[in-house]
Every structure is written in C-alpha cells, then in structure tokens.
Amino acid sequence: MAGSRRRGLQARVRPLFCALLLSLSRFVGGDGVGGDPAAGLPHRRFEYKYSFKGPHLVQSDGTVPFWAHAGNAIPSSDQIRVAPSLKSQRGSVWTKAKAAFENWEVEVTFRVTGRGRIGADGLAIWYTENQGLEGPVFGSADLWNGVGIFFDSFDNDGKKNNPAIVIIGNNGQIHYDHQNDGASQALASCQRDFRNKPYPVRAKIIYYQKTLTVMINNGFTPDKNDYEFCAKVENMIIPAQGHFGVSAATGGLADDHDVLSFLTFQLTEPGKEPPTPDKEISEKEKEKYQEEFEHFQQELDKKKEEFQKGHPDLQGQPAEEIFESVGDRELRQVFEGQNRIHLEIKQLNRQLDMILDEQRRYVSSLTEEISKRGAGMPGQHGQISQQELDTVVKTQHEILRQVNEMKNSMSETVRLVSGMQHPGSAGGVYETAQHFADIKEHLHTVKRDIDNLVQRHMLSNEKPKCPELPPFPSCLSTVHFIIFVVVQTVLFIGYIMYRSQQEAAAKKFF
C-alpha cells in the first residue's frame, strides 16, 4: 500500500516538473538567459591569504593568519566577534596584504544577534585602498577610497527603512552621512532583515566586469546556496589594489556581530588564461611536511589498533542499513524532484528580481528624458509626440505590475512546495495531492501572465482604444420614489400602533 502511494506521488511530480520546465523555457528562451549556464561562467580560484574560516581559526598567540584585527574585535577558534553586545563598541578585521584582482568574489557568513527588537549600529564589508582599522563608520575609518557594503540595523533618519543593505562608494573625499543612513550617497540598496535568524546569514559580493552585485541568503533555511538578488551597481570603479575587511559598531543599543567565515575568490573571464599558481615550496619544506605526515599517520594507525582491541564486538558486523529498499529509493526520487522544482522556482524568482530592477531603471531614465524634451523642446517638429511617449511609459508600468504579480505567484508556489515537503502522517496523501493541484494552478497563472506580458509588449506601439460605454440604465422616477416612501411610512406607523395595543392588553392581566 505504501509503495503504491509513493508511485502515485512520483507520477504526480513528473508532469508537474515538466510543466515547470516548459514555463521556464518560454520565459527565458527569447533573450538567451536560459542558455547553457556554464558557458559564460568565470573561472574561480580560491585565495587563502585573503580568507578565514573555522575551526582552529586563531593561532596560539591569538592572531588570525594573514589578517589583522583592531578595536574590540575578539577572535576565537570558530569565529571572530567583531563587536560584542556592549554599548559603544567598535571593532574591525582586515587583510594584511593588498589584493590585486581585476575581478573577485567574496562569501561572508555572519550572525547579528541581540535581545532587543531593534539593533544597532550594524556591520560593514569593505574593499578599500588602505586599512580603516578604527573609526566612526560602522567601526571603520571615514573618507575611505573604495566601496563599502553596509548592513545597517538602526534607523537614524526615522523613515522606517531599516534593517537595510546599502552600497556606498567613496573616493576618499566624502564624509559619510550617518544621520541620514547615507541615503543621498547610496548607489543601490535593499531592505532585508538579517538579525536573529535561525541559521547564519550569508552575503555573496561579486565584482565582475566593473559590475558589483550583492546576493543575500537570509538564514531561514540551512541551504547554503539559497541566495536571492539584493542590489547591483554597474560601471563601478574601485582601486586596482586594496584590502578586504569587516567592521562593526554598537551604540546605545547593542548586538553581537559575529563573522564565521570570509572566503575570497579570484575570477577570470572565459577565454583568458587562469592566474599562475604560487611558487612551489622548497625541498626542505617538503621533507618537513612529509615527516609530519608520516608521524600523524603512525599515530592514527596506533589509535585504530587500540580502538579495535577495546571494541572487538564492533568488528565484522554486516552493514545492512547501508543499502536502501525499493520504497526508500522511490521516496528519495520524489523528494529529489521536489527539490529540483524548488531550485528552479528560486532561479526564476532571482531572474524576475533582476528584470524588475532593469525595468525600474529604464522607466526612470525614460521619464527624465520625457520631462527634458517637454521642457526644452515643446514645439520642435520630427520628435515623438507626447501621447506616444505617455503610451510607452504606461506600457512599462503595466510590465512592472505583471512582473510583480508573477513574483507574488512564484512566492506562493515556493511556500506551497515548502509545506509539501513536511506532510502529516495521517492525511499526507490527500494534502500532498491538494498541494500539487495548487502548484499546478499557480504555474498556469504564471504561464498566462507571461503570455499576456509578451502580447502587451508586442502591441505596445499600437494606440490604445477605449471601450465603448454601456447604455446608461434607467433610474427610478420621483413619483414612484415618493409613493414608495409614503407606503413604507404608513406600514411602519400601523405596526407601532398594533404593538402598543398588544402591550396594553397584556398589562390588564397584571
């Protein structure tokens, strides 16, 4: 009975997965986004001299290899507490050597935890020409030359737009506007809550072909690759050589700002030769490392022999639990199909975010161009008419609305898939079937919205035609209305008189 139920679930997953892939191919097939993802990916090379990760993060003297910490930063074996949960604390950690990468990527894993509903002040990830060991900008120095990604948890300007992630660049001559949270200096931003999450928050910062992109994993799931788009800055010019760093600060309110890992990768464009490896170690160092390896290998063999002598009952037992049954294999395939659907939906959600960002930028630039042409050249011949430009702007707004609707629909689908992965034991089959039906309905909605979006885009140059007004219905005449009011009043007075007589007759018996 259980095997038939699993086969039924698997039969439902396969057509749903095919429908999802069909919808994705129709959406991304036109502009080449859905091509081979590995064709244009850059080559990634891990740079250990600009990275740290636990365990055994610190040495015996309390220092972190290749890094320098300052202020109230506290390194430990598995993390670096950049700023503790005490008032008015500042701390930072910086690479000792400068990085000379044309393109790079960093993955930072951190936690920001506190007992209050509101935190302060926040954490910052830096790439600057010089080290800012201590200062007023999230624990680092002001007037930096480079870029900073600020995880601001306190609302200084009172606009209720925090916690937020803000990208701010500087050429070494601009003071940070701390009172307004750098709103006038921000190149891009997004609102994400990164405090008190069940899992560590992960930030992926990519600088590739002069474009800075920030991806965020909010820490709601243990999936390390569950990133979503946050912000992007094009034509970003940063110093050719610089230091990577992390800083944090507290004010009247205090949070613990812990950095668990900082991983740096050098990126090389496809078609170019990857960077040359570092110089090989000398023969003397090789012999030293070989002796240490042999010593550790002998100790391991000795420990194995001691364990086998002390636990003879654990030897020679058959490992039957290693092999899975037919039912377990079918259930695993069902869950793998669900996970693939979940990942595809996440990918589509990220692409929709990026398209929405591009459309907003295009609409803003088009609106500015319309205002300039309307103010400077109102009577010039040969230009596009104001009505046609308004039609284009309205079409772009309609596209934005359709994309938002698709995004909401995909979010609802993700919620259903997450709930489907934990069905109840008693009514699991019925609830799972119901979830599949809901997911199919949402996928059809997304497909229909995409078709409408394509049709609206093709017909955007045509002039819109207003529909004809329906015939105006006949209204109630004044005479009929007066007659109706008089009849209703007479009936109401008669009812009151009848009720009074009944109450008077009832009082005679008492």
Curated annotation (Swiss-Prot):
It comes from the Eukaryota. Keywords: Disulfide bond, Endoplasmic reticulum, ER-Golgi transport, Golgi apparatus, Lectin, Membrane, Metal-binding, Phosphoprotein, Protein transport, Signal, Transmembrane, Transmembrane helix, Transport. It holds the Pfam family Lectin_leg-like. GO terms for cellular component: COPII-coated ER to Golgi transport vesicle; endoplasmic reticulum membrane; endoplasmic reticulum-Golgi intermediate compartment membrane; Golgi membrane. Ca(2+) binds at residues 152, 154, 156, 181. Residues 499-510 are cytoplasmic. Its main location: endoplasmic reticulum. SUPFAM superfamilies: Concanavalin A-like lectins/glucanases. Exists both as a covalent disulfide-linked homohexamer, and a complex of three disulfide-linked dimers non-covalently kept together. Interacts with MCFD2. May interact with TMEM115. Interacts with RAB3GAP1 and RAB3GAP2. Interacts with UBXN6. Interacts with SERPINA1/alpha1-antitrypsin. Interacts with BET1. This is Protein ERGIC-53. It comes from Chlorocebus aethiops (Green monkey). The lineage of its organism: Eukaryota, Metazoa, Chordata, Craniata, Vertebrata. The gene is LMAN1.
